[in-house]
């Protein structure tokens, strides 16, 4: 009753006058502060107050609009049962007692809210369009000096509340119609009645019974309305308690992407998404990690990154029990567990469990939008170019905690860790061989099936692995994108560059556990280990000769086929092995990169340096089982064994003479061809053997052996 009397006084009425029933106004649920109390609130408390007041107002308006749309105007037929909706908008009240320190921002928000019943317009009916328009005038011009410490309720009574629309809904039946006519005549601030028709089939909400004027039920139902979401999306069925939220939600359904990137033309639903996207072009990364200094373009990325340092994993999978640091990783894992692949390619019907995988599936378009500024190589994924850049920078961010070895990619580190654990979980069903990586097992399966999926477009040569095709392609086109920063030498493969770098550093990280011999390549170590076991699984189909390595068998096969695919561009000489061609190139260039630390003598081949070192150490590791004779070189032992067996594998095609060594055959062949490749730089005399040239040099130098 006190609240009702106060409301009547603010409207200039006496306490005993009748008021329209069933109307709950904003002031009835407003939280009130005096000016002194308001000054005691901090910014966060004021922001909270603003949100609560706006939410209350939206809920009240939702109730009011839904009630209004449930009524209709029926033209009078003289029977006295006409239903009329009267909408009165209170005129502005000029008042100088309101302070804009509290409600100014709330008022702006309220003025921006629009309530529209658009369904009626689509059906061709006249629809109620009640808009709360932004007002100009009194509230922004009020003087704080007149506000004093009066309660905000009193200040808002004459000014702020007059801006809020008071929508009075009455049902004219008997005496209620007379009350309506009387109340409207007594209210000087109410404008002319506006008749608005609604859909006839619209039913009145059951929340208030059959009588919309039953004000006694309204206070009890207030809490229900605060939670009510009366704005529903026709597409998804999702409900909202504010029309602005509904409109924002409907943008993706309508296809209205109004924010366009000026650089790439990409469209976005919201302005903040465009702002985040712009950082891709500007490379702006304002968010920095305090732990490692890494920067990010989005704050959410920084938040996810921090979990790497803290080790926090908040997202738990109910299927497999795995925990993840990011929700996106959990969603991906769930798709793997369920086998769900909801993202499908329209071209080839291939399905993916991630949207990003479908986006990266650019096989049909051939699109590669990401280009490396160093070598002009193009990529289909941004993540691929980021990892590619580490080749040029030499960055190796992934380090093994056991042996401190660093790697360019995380996959390399994961693969390396299995060396320490010796875990080989992938087993071949054909031969029982186990592998530490699934990709290795897949490649191994191709050896059994003879499958060669990767074919060269130039020469139609097929390969088992994609890396083999890439290597072959670079040989054909002569491309060498990998350059050594020390000597400027270029290579067709990154692995060759890494091996080459060990020449400058002298690094040999791979050590044999049996004899403690060290190697610069892992493949060399693996080959060496087979020497200890004596295992030779690779057998030649022509001569039944067995080899410890597949590469040795491949080299041997070329002896039978006579294939020499590697050709020198200088002298057109061909070779059966690439390594032979590389060594041959040094004959033309005069390069001798391998130097002895003892006597500073240089060599064009690493093997020659190793053999030379045995002169200083006196080491002779190769022993004949027949006579016990030892040798510095493996080739010397092989040739020696032929003395016991009498084998002479190398035969001259002209005179049928046979030799123990290939070098002896080459020397003999020069007798028939009269070739003299060894020339003296002093006098120009030529010789058919290197030893003859060396002997001739002593004439000029005066050296006596």
Swiss-Prot record:
SMART domains, per database record: KRAB, ZnF_C2H2
A Pfam family hit: KRAB
PROSITE patterns reported in the protein's UniProt record: KRAB (PS50805), ZINC_FINGER_C2H2_1 (PS00028), ZINC_FINGER_C2H2_2 (PS50157)
An example Gene Ontology CC term for this record: nucleus
Keywords: DNA-binding, Isopeptide bond, Metal-binding, Nucleus, Repeat, Transcription, Transcription regulation, Ubl conjugation, Zinc, Zinc-finger
One MF term in the entry's GO annotations: RNA polymerase II cis-regulatory region sequence-specific DNA binding
Xref: SUPFAM superfamilies: beta-beta-alpha zinc fingers (SSF57667), KRAB domain (Kruppel-associated box) (SSF109640)
Protein's GO biological process: regulation of transcription by RNA polymerase II
Keyword Repeat attached: yes
The KRAB domain, residue ranges: 24-97
Crosslink feature (Glycyl lysine isopeptide (Lys-Gly) (interchain with G-Cter in SUMO2)) location: 173, 221
InterPro entries: KRAB, KRAB_dom_sf, Znf_C2H2-type, Znf_C2H2_sf, Znf_C2H2_type
Claim: Transcription is one of the keywords in the record: yes
Residue spans, zinc finger C2H2-type: 231-253, 259-281, 287-309, 315-337, 343-364, 370-392, 398-420, 426-448, 454-476, 482-504, 510-532, 538-560, 566-588, 594-616, 622-644, 650-672, 678-700
Compartments it resides in: Nucleus
Function as written in the Swiss-Prot or TrEMBL entry: May be involved in transcriptional regulation.
Family: Belongs to the krueppel C2H2-type zinc-finger protein family.
Record-given protein name: Zinc finger protein 611
Gene name of the encoded protein: ZNF611
């Amino acid at each position: 009753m006190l609240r009702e009397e106060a409301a009547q006084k603010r409207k200039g009425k006496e306490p005993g006058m009748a008021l329209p029933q069933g109307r709950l106004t904003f002031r009835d649920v407003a939280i009130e502060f005096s000016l002194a109390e308001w000054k005691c609130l901090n910014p966060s408390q004021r922001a909270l107050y603003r949100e609560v007041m706006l939410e209350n107002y939206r809920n009240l308006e939702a109730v009011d609009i839904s009630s209004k749309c449930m009524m209709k105007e029926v033209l009078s037929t003289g029977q006295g049962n006409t239903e009329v909706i009267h909408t009165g908008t209170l005129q502005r009240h000029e008042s100088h007692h309101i302070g804009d320190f509290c409600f100014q921002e709330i008022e702006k928000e309220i003025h921006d809210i629009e309530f529209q019943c658009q369904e009626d317009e689509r059906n061709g009916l006249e629809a109620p369009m009640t808009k709360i328009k932004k007002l100009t005038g009194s509230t922004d011009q009020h003087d704080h000096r007149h506000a004093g410490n009066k309660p905000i309720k009193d200040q808002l009574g004459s000014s702020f509340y007059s801006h809020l629309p008071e929508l009075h809904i009455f049902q004219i039946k008997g005496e209620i119609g007379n009350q309506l006519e009387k109340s409207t005549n007594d209210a000087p601030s109410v404008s002319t009645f506006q008749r608005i028709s609604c859909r006839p089939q619209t039913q009145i909400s059951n929340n208030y019974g059959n009588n919309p004027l039953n004000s006694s039920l309204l206070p009890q139902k207030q809490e229900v309305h605060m939670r009510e979401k009366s704005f529903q999306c026709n597409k998804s069925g999702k409900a909202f308690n504010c029309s602005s939220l509904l409109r924002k939600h409907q943008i993706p359904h309508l296809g209205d992407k109004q924010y366009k990137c000026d650089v790439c033309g990409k469209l976005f639903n919201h302005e903040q998404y465009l702002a985040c996207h712009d950082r891709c072009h500007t490379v702006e990364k304002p968010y920095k990690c305090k732990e490692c200094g890494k920067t990010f373009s989005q704050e959410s990325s920084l938040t996810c990154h921090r979990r790497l340092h803290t080790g926090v994993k908040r997202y738990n999978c109910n299927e497999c029990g795995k925990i993840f640091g990011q929700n996106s990783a959990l969603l991906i894992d769930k798709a793997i567990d369920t086998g769900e692949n909801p993202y499908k390619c329209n071209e080839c019907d291939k399905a993916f469990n991630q949207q990003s995988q479908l986006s990266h599936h650019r096989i049909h378009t051939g699109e590669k939008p990401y280009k490396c500024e160093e070598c002009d190589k193009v990529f289909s994924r941004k993540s691929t170019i980021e990892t590619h850049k580490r080749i040029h920078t030499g960055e190796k961010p992934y380090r093994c905690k056991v042996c401190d070895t660093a790697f360019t990619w995380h996959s390399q580190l994961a693969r390396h860790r299995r060396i320490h654990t010796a875990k080989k979980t992938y087993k071949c069903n054909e031969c029982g061989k186990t592998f530490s990586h699934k990709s290795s097992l897949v490649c191994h399966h191709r050896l059994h099936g003879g499958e060669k999926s990767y074919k060269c477009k130039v020469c139609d040569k097929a390969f088992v692995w994609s890396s083999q095709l890439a290597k072959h392609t670079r040989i054909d086109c002569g491309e060498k994108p990998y350059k050594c920063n020390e000597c400027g030498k270029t290579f067709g493969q990154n692995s060759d560059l890494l091996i080459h770098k060990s020449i400058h550093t002298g690094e040999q990280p791979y050590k044999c556990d049996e004899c403690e011999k060290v190697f610069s390549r892992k493949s060399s170590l693996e080959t060496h280990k087979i020497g200890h076991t004596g295992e030779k699984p690779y057998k030649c189909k022509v001569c039944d000769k067995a080899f410890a390595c597949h590469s040795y068998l491949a080299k041997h096969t070329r002896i039978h086929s006579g294939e020499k695919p590697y050709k020198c561009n200088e002298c057109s000489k061909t070779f059966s092995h690439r390594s032979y061609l590389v060594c041959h190139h040094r004959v033309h260039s005069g390069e001798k990169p391998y130097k002895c630390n003892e006597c500073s003598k240089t060599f064009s081949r690493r093997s020659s340096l190793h053999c030379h070192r045995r002169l200083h150490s006196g080491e002779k590791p190769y022993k004949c089982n027949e006579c016990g004779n030892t040798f510095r070189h493996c080739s010397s032992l092989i040739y020696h064994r032929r003395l016991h067996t009498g084998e002479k594998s190398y035969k001259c095609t002209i005179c049928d003479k046979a030799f123990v060594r290939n070098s002896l055959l080459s020397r003999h062949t020069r007798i028939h061809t009269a070739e003299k490749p060894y020339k003296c730089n002093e006098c120009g005399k030529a010789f058919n053997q290197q030893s003859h040239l060396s002997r001739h040099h002593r004439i000029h130098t005066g050296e006596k052996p």
